[in-house]
């Protein structure tokens, strides 16, 4: 097993409920600090990679956010390489989407505790909790980022470029990223599932059963569908807001399930 994926976490309970969500959690977790000061949005894939590296360097390897950040960094580096190699039919679309997408993560990562987007709260609250494996943190971060942030990023990108989700090669280019994510997801699952102790440890077996219920590609397929819905709702402020509220709540629920300590 990857040493970074086998490290255990410690936690200092504060015995405080999240404001406005009494009874949802028995306690809140004392979380390591993120980036020390708010940073401006990045404007290129190269800047995004550098920012991801900075965030990772400032976190303990066992921090739940670091577990996700490592996986995201690897995927972003691969996407950047493919953009440079002309792998995508519309590199401008993919570059803008990649930058818009990653900035949503950066905003969540540096948000004050009371301002963390709902979809990201499970990971941010439980990133130092005991009994949760690194694979759970990595997939919970992917859940928040893909299920909630990706539809928003697609619509924002299309708006900025004066196009629509169904135009040109957008969907085909979007789907080309799936191969990279397949490799990243397979790698993290294999590093966990190939552990010799897995067959003997009921805890690890339970975690394995839990994380196999969620896959990145299924989440991305749904994210594209939700982007199409958001695109149609872009001129209806009320309907769009209600849809986004429901999306955030559903994403948060899935995140809490993925982060179940077993």
Describe the function of each predicted region.
Residues 73-165:
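Long acidic/polar interaction regions in large eukaryotic complex-forming proteins
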Residues 18-99, 103, 108:
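Leu/Val/Ala/Ile-rich N-terminal alpha-helices, chiefly Sec-type signal peptides and the beginnings
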Residues 210-262:
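A cross-kingdom marker for long, charged
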Residues 10, 14-16:
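Extended, well-folded catalytic/binding cores that form a central cleft or groove in large enzyme
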Residues 151-207:
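Short helix-loop boundary/capping segments
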Residues 4-7:
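Short, intrinsically disordered low-complexity segments enriched in Ser/Thr with adjacent Pro
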